Structure formats: C-alpha cells, structure tokens
Amino acid sequence: MARTAPVEPPLRHSAPPSPAAGEPRTSVEAAVAPRRVLFADEALGLPLAQLRRYRPWGGPGAGKMAAAAGQDGGGGGGADEDDDGEDGDEGEEEEEACPEPSPLCPVPAGGGFYLVPTFSLPPAPGRLERLGRVMVELEALLPPPGAVPGGAGVWVPGGRPPVLRGLVRVLNRSFEKAVHVRASHDGWASFCDHPARYVPRSPPWAGAGGTGAGDPILDPGLGLGPGQASASSPDDGGRTDRFAFQLPFAEGAGDGARLDFVVRYETPEGTFWANNHGRNYTVLLRIAPAPTPTDAEGLPQQQQLPQLEPQPECQGPVEAEARQLKSCMKPVRRRPAEEELKTKNMDDNTFAMAEHPDVQESVGPLVAPTPLRPWPQMTLQVSDVPMTGNPAEEGDVPRSSPPVAFTEVLQAPAIRIPPSSPLCGLGGSPRDQASGPDASEGATGPFLEPSQQQAEATWGVSSENGGGLEAVSGSEELLGEDTIDQELEQLYLSHLSRLRAAVAAGGAGGGGEGSTDGGMSPSHPLGILTDRDLILKWPGPERALNSALAEEITLHYARLGRGVELIKDTEDPDDEGEGEEGLSVTPSSPEGDSPKESPPEILSGARSVVATMGDVWLPWAEGSGCDGPVVLGTEGQFIGDPEKGMGKDTSSLHMNRVIAGVTESLGEAGTEAQIEVTSEWAGSLDPISGKEPASPVLLQGQNPTLLSPLGAEVCLSSVARPHVSSQDEKDAGPSLEPPKKSPTLAVPAECVCALPPQLRGPLTQTLGVLAGLVVVPVALNSGVSLLVLALCLSLAWFS
C-alpha cells in the first residue's frame, strides 16, 4: 500500500484589524491621508539625473572625463560618493599603471608632418597561414585624420595632433579576446597600453546611424572609404578578426620624434605578441612644410623617391595601390644612355600593364627587347662518368679526372658463338663449329647472334672502378682487343683455308671407296684437343674462335711433322648408352658452368692420332713403310654384347677417347690386336645428357686398312702400342679395361719419324709467327691457358 504525502493545510492570511466600533470616523480618514512626493531638484537643488562615464583603461582623456564627472557629481550626497568609491579607486589604479599624458600639442598651422615607419609590413598573401603560427599580426598603418594625399605621399597639415593609426589582424580562437598596443616615447623607459577596438566585418557607415557613426576611432577619417574595408580585408569565413588602434605622439614632439610599439593579443588560451620579430615597430615623425602645387601635380620619380620610399608602409594596401596607379600614369622620360636598363625594367613594366591595362595608352609604345642571338657552336668537354654502376654513384664524378671529349665509338664486333647442347655444350657437328668461312650453314645449327646483353657486357664497366680514367682505359682496352681479335680471325681463316685447299688438292687424287659405316667416332688420344674442345675449354666466348683456329693450324703442322693421319672428328649423338665406361672426368669447379682449366699437356715421343675437321691425306715422313692398311670402324660393328661386364655411372662425367680399329700386321697369322688408347684430361668437363660418344673398336683382319668416308686408304708404317690388351680369337666382344694413368704412355714409340730437313726451316718460322700471334691476345686477355699451351708446343717441337 502506497503512502500518500501529508497534506499541508492552506496558509491563512490574517485580515487587517477593523476599526473599533466605538472609534470616530474622522480619525480613521486622517490616518490614511495621501503622501506628498518631493524631488531633489526642487527640494534640495540637486540635478534630477547624474551621468558618470567609466573607462576600463587610463588612456588619454581619462583625466578630463574624470574631472567632468567630478564636476557633475560634486554636490552629490554621501551615498553616491560611497557607491562610486570603488570605481574611483579603480580609476586611480589604472591611472597609476598608465600615467596620464600631457595634453597633445598640435603641429603649428603653418607646417605639416609625415609619419615614416622604419619597418615593412608582411604581404597579404599567406596571411592566414602565418596567423596560424603567430596568432596576431600588424596588418596596415592608416593615415592620420585630415591627411591630404599629394604627389609626395600623405601629408598632414598643421594644426592637428600627430597620431598613428593602424589595423591588427588576429586569429579568431575564442569569443573573448582583447587586443592592446603597448607604446613608448622614450625608448621603453616608460610605456602605456592602448586598447584596440574591434572592427566589424561590414563598414560601420553602411546604414544611417550605424554602429560606428560618430566614433572617434572608426569614423571616415580613419582612412577606410566605402568598400575599402572589405577590399583590404578579404573574407576568410570568420577565421580572423580585425582591431583598430590609435597612438598619439608625446607632448611637444618635433621633427625626428620616435614612437615604439608592440601588439598584445590576450585569449583564454594564452597571450601572444607581435613585435616585428623581436625588433619592435618604430615610426618616426617628420615635420615638413605644405607641398607646393608642383608637388601636388606630381614630380619625376627620381625626385619623389626620397619622400615616397617609406610612404607605402604608412598607408593601407588600397592607398598604396592608388598611389602606384598614379605613378604609372606618368611614365618616366629616359635618356638615350639609359636604353641599356630597359631590358631589366621590362618585367616590372609588363607586370604593371597586365594589372592595369587602361594605363597602357598613356604610357606609350614600349620598345621591344632585342632578341638574343644564339651562341656560336662550341665543343663542350665533360668529365666522363662510369657507364654502369649504382644510380647513387653515377652523379659522383671525380674532380681530379681530366675532361675528355666524347667521340663516336664503333659497335662491338659480332662473334658467332654456338649455343650449348645436351652433349658437349655446343650445337651442330664438331666439323662446323670452328671450321671457318668455308663451313656449311645448314649443318652448323643455331648460332647466338650478339644481343643487347652481350653489347652491354662488352661495354659494361664495373662500379668498383676508382674513377673516370679507369672506365676510359677499360673501354679502350676492349676496343683494342676486339680489333686484334678480328685481325687474328681473318689471318687464321685465310691461312687455314690455304692449308685446307692444299690438303684437299692432295687428297683428291687418292680417292677410294668410302666406308659404309657412317660417321666416325671422336678420338684424340694423348691429350690433344680438337677445335670443339678448345671452344669448350676456353673461359670466354670472345676468344673461342681464334683459339680454335690457332690450335687447328698448330695441330696441322704437328701432324705434318709427326707423320700422323688426320682422323675425322664426328660424333653420333644417336648412339645412346654406348661407351659410357670410358674415362671419368671430375669437374674442376663446383659450378661447372664456365670451367677455367689449363690446356692438357702434350706428351713428347708418344704417337698421336687426332680427330680433325675433315678427311685429309697428309704425306708421311720419308722412309716410313706400310705393312698393311688399317680400317676404322664404329662400335656398332662389335660382335657380342658391348655392355657385358660394364658398369654404368650416370652421376659422373665421362669422356671416351678410344682409338680402335688401328691394327698392324704383327707377323703372326690369326693374331688379333686391339689397341685402346685413353686420354685423361685433368679437370676437363663434358656434360653428359644420356648420350655418350661411340667408342671405336677393332675390326678383325689380317691386313686391315683405314677407310675414310671418301674411300681413301691410309697406310701406317709403324704404330706405337703404349697400352695393348690381347684377347683370344674366341672372345667376340671387345675388352675395354678401365683407364689408368700408365707410365707407358710417355714411353717413346717404337718408330719415331724424324722431321725432314726441308720442313724444319718453314716450320720454325711458322711456329714463331704463330707464337707471336698467340702471345698477343694472351697478354691482352691474361689467358694463362693459351700461354702454357704455347710453351708446351714450343718445348714439344724444339726438344
């Protein structure tokens, strides 16, 4: 059950006591008779109203206003004096903070004055951004009231006190704000704070009886005409406010009087100052007589300059603009000697004409500037910079490097480099890989044309170079090497073509039936390299062709002296998995991409049978006999299982260089001999892709012959047998023993053909020329392998 609030009894007002019944009527009427009102002006002689004016600061005129208020209220009662006692004390405190200045002394009527500021006002553009940082800024200085604009600036006639007026722009951070201007006339020995009045956004005289009508500060004498307030203060959406101030000069101020002031802006957030970046604002007073009519009409700019120089700072933006327009209306007459300065002043005149096009007619025609003549062509010398490198290092040009002139550089020569193949890293048959210009294009396979990457690699200079001179020397070295390579290539090819033509002419007459066995197996025993191997072994594509040609020429002459037939060097990549039990070659570097190995050594005294680029007949040494022909065959002619008892190792690299089918009549009938020669190269590298070169084997026969594909017979006088394994006739398959580094390989052969005397002289000269041709590129390219090979050849031939 809800409780109800207690009900208060209604208030009862006691009725006025009624007159006693026995009381007479006349006494009651006398008690309620009306009162009479007495006014102070009638009874006491005081004014009916008392007016007091209060100022929150002790500025100029405060003493006069206080004196007037004292005269008005001098006869007031004690109550009024008590009521106004606090206000009087506050006024006295304010007057103590800012002592009352003496009455202003106007300038004599016969003269006038100018106000000359010693500072420059900040420009209007970017004012809002600056206010965001400093909060308060002095916007403009306004002319004093009664100023007369003349040719020499704004002049104030005599009879008026010198005062300074200005506008302050503040950032509107809060509604409650106060702006004061602290001024000093004696170099800050004493100062006084003057309040600044808020300037509304609309002109105060917009309507009749406006807010600012009659105001001593915001009257038309302030210098802001109709529309000028909005012109000098563009609308910024209420983000800023303007305040106006007026500063008087000291009593008896004469010519050269000084007025220093700063602006203080007080907000609830804090107090901000504008003091001209710590230098304070200073305005000087200049007493000057009234301007003459000539001055009013306008004088030449040179004579007006001393007086007009500080005047734009003393005026607002609008007044300064109007004065500039008038000066533009009367152009300056220049003498012929001043024609040189027209080019410099042309920009200023163009800016003035573009801003005020109506002035162009009065200015007159402008003299067109003289067109600039182009400079004569000259050779510019620029310090060279590295061609390749980091972008941060490209601009760093060493000052110590002498300037060099740019010259046209020929393109790097195109060198045909066969691409890598699965078998040996080269495309096409070995016959056509380094056979020179007479090679057929159809059998060579694809070649790599010089691409942009190769050209960049040719011209690329490492960023590790110390300066521009090293880059220049590197490019010159590359150019010299390429030129030498081209010359060597042409020399090698021409010499080799003559040798081949001679060999082909010699072998054309001794033709026979060709072999039907197909291509011959590659073989080069005793470490002698073919052109294909030279290209593979050489660590750099730009030297491969020349090295192969040089080696072919060297081996050609070597075979001439040793009396060894040329064996066709071809490979049958279709025979897969045959002869994999040959010599296992371990790569010299873990990468295996660009092996850099020294050339194999040539064993003197051993019989060398080398594969070449074709079927060539060579004359044998004198006195050499031939027991019987020797026939070359392929492994496809074996009888039996070629892989019997042979283990395959696909993870290792193999190269079989077996010379088989070379037999000799040993004097015993029915005797079979099989010669197996294996050449082991230290560090040689041939990639294996599932296809091994066919291993040649021995063909049986009493009088075997060597049949070339063209049907030519080769007669061997005596063949060395460094490593021979005999087999019985019952064994049909070949017996391939593991390759061993047998010392018997270096044993001299049974019959070594001596070099004919008629060939020793030409051969010595040829080897000397070839040695010089080989040493030059080796010295340029630092090829140690070719140098070692040349030394080995020299030792082999002349030992």
From Swiss-Prot:
Q: Which residues lie on this side of the membrane: Extracellular?
A: 790-799
* Keyword Lyase listed: no
Q: Which Pfam families match?
A: CBM_21
- The record lists the membrane-crossing segments as 769-789
Q: What GO molecular function terms would the record report?
A: glycogen binding; protein phosphatase 1 binding; protein phosphatase binding
**Entry membrane topology:** Single-pass membrane protein
**Bias type Polar residues, positions:** 450-464
Q: What is this protein called?
A: Protein phosphatase 1 regulatory subunit 3F
Q: What's the source species for this entry? A: Homo sapiens (Human)
